[in-house]
């Protein structure tokens, strides 16, 4: 295993960013490095620190044409047990197999480096390009995500900022870089359900009301329900119970209440209001004394074939020789906030096989491939 030397500009920058321990919401000066580079390339910089989160918006070009934005996050998830890593997770080493190892290599400091180097090259090659190249970067994607991209998008919307196309650098690829891009994501609707009973002694059930016995049939019906059939772009909406708690810990006490935590990952065939109404109808049918706290993490979004998806797909083809697959699978991303502006959003990044894991790693050479794909996309849309 050797430390990276004589590397491409993209790999040099990726290693610099990985060496900065930017666990959510700490940025560890990753954005300062990026802004300095972008400023030197002629970008107009707008730092936006919101509460404890660092963000920035940067633009290069004119306001009378289309805007292509690169979006991403400098924060990473915790490393887990450091002793289980093959190297220090913030050392950014390239091993004997050519793998770049470190927290954030895939998710998503590698993408940030590729985006930035591609943009530097593009504005140098095409100083009078059409429209604008933009960057929207945050240090709060892996955490609560209240003061990151969501808050920046709200500010951009308030001042009617134009944003036609957006490439989010999330690690979309599965086996080979560019084999999959995300052209949408399911919505995420969470809930905490409380079913109230009456606490009592297990030997005197007639004096109590067991919320477990009452709630289980309703939960079973919710789990068996077919919420929709999906469509050409999305699988059917799914319902999953993630936590179920009741009882005092004593073996002779009927609990007074039951708490169930569940989540919908829903397609564009369902609405938040529709799902909530159907849940309420099932709970009422079982005559439960219930209360639900709902938490919407994001609405579903979809970018159908058009200028952005066509440019990304053809760039992948020209650089790698491979056809890409557009998919809406997986969890949520900050693309859900950007899509509210009416923006076409595509996620394209490295292979995601080891994200959030111990020994997170990607093939180092993939970042140079990704840089070229980003560059070719810029050329197709703005040159």
Swiss-Prot record:
Q: Which residues form the active site?
A: 75, 141
The pathway this protein participates in, as annotated, is: Amino-acid biosynthesis; L-lysine biosynthesis via DAP pathway; LL-2,6-diaminopimelate from (S)-tetrahydrodipicolinate (succinylase route): step 3/3
Which EC class is the enzyme in? Answer: hydrolase
Question: Does Protein biosynthesis appear among the keywords?
Answer: no
Q: Which Gene3D superfamilies match?
A: Zn peptidases
Q: Which EC number applies?
A: 3.5.1.18
> What PROSITE patterns would the database entry show?
ARGE_DAPE_CPG2_2
GO MF entry, a single one: succinyl-diaminopimelate desuccinylase activity
- The residues the record assigns to binding Zn(2+) 1 are 73, 107, 170
Per UniProt, Zn(2+) 2 binds at 107, 142, 356
Single GO biological process annotation from the record: L-arginine biosynthetic process
List the cysteine pairs that form cystine: none
- Pfam families noted in UniProt: M20_dimer, Peptidase_M20
InterPro entries for the chain: ArgE/DapE_CS, Bact_exopeptidase_dim_dom, DapE_proteobac, Peptidase_M20, Peptidase_M20_dimer, Peptidase_M20A
Q: Which UniProt keywords apply?
A: Amino-acid biosynthesis, Cobalt, Diaminopimelate biosynthesis, Hydrolase, Lysine biosynthesis, Metal-binding, Zinc
Q: How is the cofactor bound?
A: Binds 2 Zn(2+) or Co(2+) ions per subunit.
User: What cofactor does this chain's UniProt record say it requires?
Assistant: Zn(2+); Co(2+)
Q: Which reaction does it catalyse?
A: N-succinyl-(2S,6S)-2,6-diaminopimelate + H2O = (2S,6S)-2,6-diaminopimelate + succinate
Family the entry assigns: Belongs to the peptidase M20A family. DapE subfamily.
Report quaternary structure and partners.
Answer: Homodimer.
Q: What does this protein do?
A: Catalyzes the hydrolysis of N-succinyl-L,L-diaminopimelic acid (SDAP), forming succinate and LL-2,6-diaminopimelate (DAP), an intermediate involved in the bacterial biosynthesis of lysine and meso-diaminopimelic acid, an essential component of bacterial cell walls.
Question: NCBIfam families under this entry?
Answer: dapE_proteo, PRK13009.1
**Protein name per Swiss-Prot or TrEMBL:** Succinyl-diaminopimelate desuccinylase
Gene symbol? Answer: dapE
């Amino acid at each position: 295993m050797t430390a990276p030397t004589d590397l491409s500009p993209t790999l040099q920058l990726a290693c610099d960013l990985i060496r900065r321990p930017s666990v959510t919401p700490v940025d560890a000066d990753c954005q300062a490095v990026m802004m300095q580079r972008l400023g030197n390339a002629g970008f107009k910089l707008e730092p936006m620190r919101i509460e404890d989160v660092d963000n920035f918006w940067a633009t290069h070009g004119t306001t009378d044409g289309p805007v292509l934005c690169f979006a991403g996050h400098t924060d990473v998830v915790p490393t887990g047990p450091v002793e289980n890593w093959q190297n220090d997770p913030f050392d950014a080493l390239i091993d004997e197999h050519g793998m770049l190892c470190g927290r954030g290599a895939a998710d998503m400091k590698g993408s940030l480096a590729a985006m930035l180097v591609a943009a530097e090259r593009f504005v140098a090659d095409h100083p009078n390009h059409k429209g604008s190249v933009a960057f929207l970067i945050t240090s709060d994607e892996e955490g609560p995500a209240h003061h990151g991209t969501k808050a920046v998008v709200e500010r951009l919307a308030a001042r009617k900022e134009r944003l036609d196309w957006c490439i989010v650098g999330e690690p979309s690829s599965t086996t080979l870089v560019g084999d999959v891009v995300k052209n949408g994501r399911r919505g995420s609707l969470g809930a905490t359900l409380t079913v109230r009973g009456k606490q009592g002694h297990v030997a005197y059930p007639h004096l109590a009301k067991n919320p477990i016995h009452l709630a289980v049939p309703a939960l079973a019906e919710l789990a068996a329900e077919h919420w929709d059939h999906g469509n050409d772009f999305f699988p059917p909406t799914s319902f999953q119970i993630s936590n179920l708690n009741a009882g005092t810990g004593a073996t002779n006490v009927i609990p007074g209440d039951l708490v169930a935590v569940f989540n919908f990952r829903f397609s564009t065939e369902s609405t938040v209001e529709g799902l909530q109404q159907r849940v309420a109808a099932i709970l009422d049918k079982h005559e439960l004394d219930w209360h639900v706290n709902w938490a919407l993490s994001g609405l579903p979004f979809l970018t159908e074939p058009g200028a952005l998806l066509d440019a990304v797909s053809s760039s992948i083809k020209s650089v790698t020789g491979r056809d890409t697959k557009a998919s809406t699978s997986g969890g949520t991303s900050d693309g859900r906030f950007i899509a509210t502006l009416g923006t076409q959003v595509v996620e394209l990044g490295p292979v995601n096989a080891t994200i959030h894991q111990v020994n997170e790693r990607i093939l180092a050479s993939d970042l140079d491939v990704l840089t070229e794909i980003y560059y070719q996309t810029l050329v197709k849309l703005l040159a």
